Structures are given as structure tokens and as C-alpha cells.
Amino acid sequence: TLALATSGLSAWCIVPALNGSANSEDTGVKETTGSSAYLYSATVGGGYEVDCRQRDLSNNVSGAWTRDISSVNNAAYLEGVSRMFAGHEVCLQFSNNLTTPVRVEVNGSWDSN
């Protein structure tokens, strides 16, 4: 069957303090094996920065972290890996820095590609 990428997905989540992590509100479907996902129009509360990566929920593999996403640096391609197969369910995973003392709200949109 043909797997079509999903776009305009919600990246919203609350990331716990002190290196906490959280997944995006929406999940999407990979259209192309190993492709990068795209995060755009991101906002990160309190002027903080978070890290983000693409995560394959179907087989629990993740791409590399993209560092320092913020309300200013608010778009990024999130690396895929060869084991992220077309048709698999994927999400974005966000992580706070070790030194971020508060939980942080992240918002934005993303495409699974």
C-alpha cells in the first residue's frame, strides 16, 4: 500500500524540567524510508531552548538530536535513519537542557515526510 506523508501536525507538548523529554501531540506516517521530518513555526516558552529528534514509534528507533530549537531558531530538518520505514508511525521527541529548571511548553507544526 502507498504511504503518504502527513503534514501540518501539531508539535505541542510540555517538556519536563532538568533534561526531561516529551513527545509531540500528533504522530504522523513516513512516506519515504529514512527521510527527514520538518519542524517549523516552533515556539518555546520562557525564552528557553530545547533539543528535538524524530522518533519511529513502530520500531523504536530515533534520529540524531537537533540542538537549540527556540522561538528564534524555530525551524529544522530532523534527521531520519534507514530503519524508519515508509508507512511507520513517527513523532517528534523534545528534550530540555540539564540546566533548565522549569517545564517548558513547545508549540509548532511539523511534516513527517
Residue locations for each model-derived region?
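Post-signal peptide N-terminal regions of Sec-secreted extracellular proteins
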Residues: 6-113
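Classic N-terminal secretory signal peptides
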Residues: 1-5
